[in-house]
Amino acid sequence: MKVLVNNHLVEREDATVDIEDRGYQFGDGVYEVVRLYNGKFFTYNEHIDRLYASAAKIDLVIPYSKEELRELLEKLVAENNINTGNVYLQVTRGVQNPRNHVIPDDFPLEGVLTAAAREVPRNERQFVEGGTAITEEDVRWLRCDIKSLNLLGNILAKNKAHQQNALEAILHRGEQVTECSASNVSIIKDGVLWTHAADNLILNGITRQVIIDVAKKNGIPVKEADFTLTDLREADEVFISSTTIEITPITHIDGVQVADGKRGPITAQLHQYFVEEITRACGELEFAK
């Protein structure tokens, strides 16, 4: 397996990170995950635009142009012969010696790019049968719009869900539902798609954006606004979405069944529209539903 370290492809076991890299010591960096279908990137530009936007919000300079970055990632995918999978890439602020919270202003740090590509098949069964979720207080910082390497709050919530045999943790600040530990959450109520507004309390998921777009194009009303735990529990349908899980229905929350406990009709429609978008961009999907 080859991975990318700056502009070099190296064997996985030969890849190294400096112990005084600010990403390693502070989580000082940003990242993205881009999906591949039939060996082709899906919503690549949207992901990379978000990467550069996240970097700009923390005054981090990515040491490659968008064109150079695409060329590097395409080489990474080709070298590993990825058909259906994910590319994980991150950029840290770089090495600072000696370690200091303060970013030096007397000399520029050189950002460090790393990336890996892996085959990750689509989970067709999960898209139909769905999964369960727990609710958990959202204790993360207030800049969730930045796709930062700082994910400890997400990790704790995700692992709590895992310990309870749940797929996800739906996060809330008091009564206000925000998103999940590693995905966005949406509800359907009276035929309306309802999801939290794209503000600082959530990451504006690329899949979320595609869902909103196809919903509007196909006459499904969309409401981007706060909703409560009560709204969540009384929803007709609940689903989560992300680059890797596409649109996955939630059938039970905190052990309580959502509606009839099955994927709802609008969730199914939205997933079909989503698959059509993938097909247009990347070609027909084998076994797609």
From Swiss-Prot:
Pyridoxal 5'-phosphate binds at R50, E179. One of its GO terms (cellular component) is cytosol. It catalyses: D-alanine + 2-oxoglutarate = D-glutamate + pyruvate. It comes from the Bacteria. Gene3D superfamilies: 3.30.470.10, D-amino Acid Aminotransferase, subunit A, domain 2 (3.20.10.10). The keyword DNA-binding does not apply. Substrate binds at Y31, R99, H101. It is an enzyme of class 2 (transferase). The keyword Transferase applies. GO terms for molecular function: D-alanine-2-oxoglutarate aminotransferase activity; pyridoxal phosphate binding. Belongs to the class-IV pyridoxal-phosphate-dependent aminotransferase family. Acts on the D-isomers of alanine, leucine, aspartate, glutamate, aminobutyrate, norvaline and asparagine. The enzyme transfers an amino group from a substrate D-amino acid to the pyridoxal phosphate cofactor to form pyridoxamine and an alpha-keto acid in the first half-reaction. The second half-reaction is the reverse of the first, transferring the amino group from the pyridoxamine to a second alpha-keto acid to form the product D-amino acid via a ping-pong mechanism. This is an important process in the formation of D-alanine and D-glutamate, which are essential bacterial cell wall components. This is D-alanine aminotransferase. The lineage of its organism: Bacteria, Bacillati, Bacillota, Bacilli, Bacillales.
